[in-house]
Every structure is written in structure tokens, then in C-alpha cells.
Design a protein with these regions (language model features):
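Protein kinase glycine-rich loop
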Residues: 32-38, 43
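AlphaC helix of the eukaryotic protein kinase fold
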Residues: 61-85
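Activation-segment/catalytic-loop signature of the eukaryotic protein kinase fold
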Residues: 97
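Conserved short submotifs of the Hanks-type protein kinase catalytic core
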Residues: 101-115, 119
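Protein kinase catalytic-loop region centered on the HRD/HxD motif
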Residues: 141-152
Length: 340
């Protein structure tokens, strides 16, 4: 009997994502707030004027400033299909997908809360309690076990891709680096985030990955949450690899009374060699949660803390009066009719 709790979820390999035209799809959304920007593009909070709910729209540039392709449309479509296939309470749902000549758009479930990265940045000590870490490990364990059982590796598990809502629910997002299994296995990786990738994922040219790459990354996230810093963060892949080979500092050297069983689970999952790690997310979470903390109390604590941190933050919501036909841009609002 696995120690982490189970939820009913559905795998839908034939979820339709028929590329509703950008004019038809985006016309219904009113921009409210820019949630994040970066090399991936931007994420905007928008109001769905039809269903009267908030959604998050990820806008991904297809052409960079030099006029060269920035993101292949097939890569974006692959991300949309992968996330849409996995319908699970701990995975952020993709609602729709479209593109025009300049951008691709993923319309996603809006999670009202914050990322684990923001949570750790703002909470006292920049770390989790044992109970909070147990709740996060339990939720991510369920999400990843479900994904793996349906032939999907995430390959970009990090605090920025873990969302916590006001009820203490934890959801995994961003399947942009995901790999789907085939008759020959998962093959190699297409990248990831330095500090959370194991050696086989860092080796983009010849390395091959499987479920144990996600085991490694999940262990990095839980280690960071408990100890206050990621064990293998570095400026370059080579430096990160050196840190991995050198081994992580034992948590008990950083935190008094660290549970021995949880420490053993983390150190095993952080092994440089895949064969030395647990063979599955389920096996890792069973060992980790056996001695870490209370999942139920952790969820209650996350709910309370996210509420308190959100109350301290002044919410900025852009006025949308007169912008019903608008779509976000980096510099404000562009009328939908101007998009070719």
C-alpha cells in the first residue's frame, strides 16, 4: 500500500486541441495582469468573458527579435497536447491552444495562489516545515506517478513550476520539456533547468532519460524546500555536474533533528547514477513520507501561509474597461483586429 494518498484522475489521449483561431479564441479574454515574463514569453491572467472565470494564458513567441524562429510551433503544440492528456487534480489543466504568425497561446487553468519559488522567497527562513514538505511531496508524487504511468516525463520540475493555491492544493505546471515514451523508451532530453537536472539529462547529446530523472528533480525540490537552497545550483551545466558528483550536503548537517528516513530517501534520490536512485516516484515518496511529517497538517499550514502572504501583497489588477476585444502585448494592449 503506497503511503502517499491517491486521487481519481483520467488520462485522455484524444483530448481535442483543434487550434481555434486566435481571433475567435482570444477575443473572449480580457487581460487583467501580467503574471510572469521571461525567455519563454509571458503569462497573463485574463478574464474569460463567456464563463466568467479567470484563466492563465501563456504567450510564446514564434519569432525572436532577429527574425529567426524562437519556438517551433510543433514544440508548443506538443506541450499543449501533453498537458491536455493528463487530467489530474495535481496537474494544471490546459483548456485551449491557438497561434497566429507571431505567437502561440496556451490557455490554462488559473491557480489563485503562488509558486513554490515565491513561497520560499517570502516565507521566514526561506524554507518549509517538515509537514509542508510532506504535503508538497505527496501532491507532486501523485501528479508524477500519474504522468509516468501514462508515458510522460516532466523533466523540468522546479519550485517555479509548482503552484500552491489558497486552499493548500499543490499543482504541477509547464510540460514544455516533457518527453513521451515510445517503443524505444523516452530517448534523450531537450533541456531543463540547471540545478535540477541529473547527469543523464545534462548530457543533451548522448544521454538518455527515464522516470529516475524526475525522481532526481523532485528530490532537489524537496531538499531545497527543507534546507533553504538547491543542492546542485550552479552557473553552468559543467559546474552543476561537478556538484552532483561531489554529492549533496547531508540535510542533518544543516537542520537539527532531520528525520533519518527522509534523509536517506533524499540522498538516495540525489545519486549521480540513475541505477542508485529509487526506480519510481512512488517508491521514492513512500520512503520519504514514512518519516517526514503529516501531509494533512502540511496542507493546512500551506493554506494558512499562502493566505497570509497573499494578504501582505498589494494586488495589482489592470483595468479592462473598454478592452473587451484586446489582447496583451509587452507594452500594453493591442486590438485583436490589428493581429494578422
Amino acid at each position: 500500500m503506497p503511503l502517499f494518498s491517491q486521487h481519481t484522475a483520467r488520462f485522455s489521449p484524444d483530448v481535442p486541441l483543434e487550434g481555434t483561431s486566435s481571433r475567435e479564441l482570444l477575443k473572449r479574454y480580457q487581460p487583467l495582469e501580467t503574471l510572469a515574463t521571461g525567455g519563454f514569453g509571458s503569462i497573463e491572467i485574463c478574464r474569460d468573458t463567456h464563463l466568467r472565470r479567470r484563466v492563465a494564458i501563456k504567450r510564446i513567441p514564434l519569432i525572436n527579435g532577429a527574425g529567426m524562429p524562437a519556438s517551433d510551433i510543433m514544440d508548443v503544440l506538443r506541450e499543449a497536447h501533453t498537458a491536455a492528456m493528463l487530467q489530474h487534480p495535481n496537474i494544471v489543466q490546459v483548456i485551449d491552444f491557438t497561434h497566429d504568425t507571431a505567437y502561440a497561446y496556451l490557455v490554462m487553468e488559473y491557480v489563485d495562489g503562488m509558486s513554490l519559488a515565491e513561497f520560499l522567497h517570502r516565507v521566514d527562513g526561506h524554507s518549509l516545515t517538515f509537514d509542508e514538505a510532506a504535503a508538497i511531496a505527496d501532491a507532486l508524487g501523485q501528479a508524477l506517478t500519474f504522468a509516468h504511468s501514462n508515458g510522460v516525463l516532466h523533466l523540468d520540475i522546479k519550485p517555479a513550476n509548482v503552484l500552491i493555491d489558497h486552499s493548500g492544493n499543490v499543482k504541477l505546471t509547464d510540460f514544455g520539456m516533457a518527453r513521451l515514451s515510445s517503443a524505444g523508451g523516452f530517448g534523450g532530453s531537450r533541456g531543463g533547468t540547471i540545478g535540477y537536472m541529473p547527469p543523464e539529462q545534462l548530457d543533451i547529446e548522448t544521454g538518455t532519460v527515464d522516470e529516475r530523472a524526475d525522481v532526481f528533480a523532485l528530490a532537489c525540490v524537496i531538499y531545497e524546500g527543507l534546507c533553504g537552497s538547491a543542492p546542485f545550483m550552479a552557473a553552468t551545466p559543467a559546474d552543476s555536474l561537478d556538484r552532483i558528483i561531489g554529492g549533496a550536503t547531508y540535510p542533518s548537517e544543516l537542520i537539527p533533528h532531520f528525520p533519518p528516513g527522509a534523509e536517506a530517501a533524499l540522498m538516495s534520490a540525489l545519486s549521480p547514477m540513475p541505477q542508485d536512485r529509487p526506480n519510481s516516484i512512488e517508491a521514492f515518496c513512500d520512503q520519504l513520507l514514512a518519516g517526514l511529517g503529516s501531509v494533512r497538517e502540511g496542507r493546512r499550514s500551506l493554506e494558512q501561509m499562502v493566505g497570509e502572504l497573499s494578504d501582505d501583497e498589494q494586488e495589482l489588477v489592470l483595468s479592462v474597461e473598454g478592452r473587451a476585444d484586446g489582447i496583451f502585448t509587452e507594452n500594453g494592449i493591442t486590438v485583436i483586429d490589428e493581429i494578422k
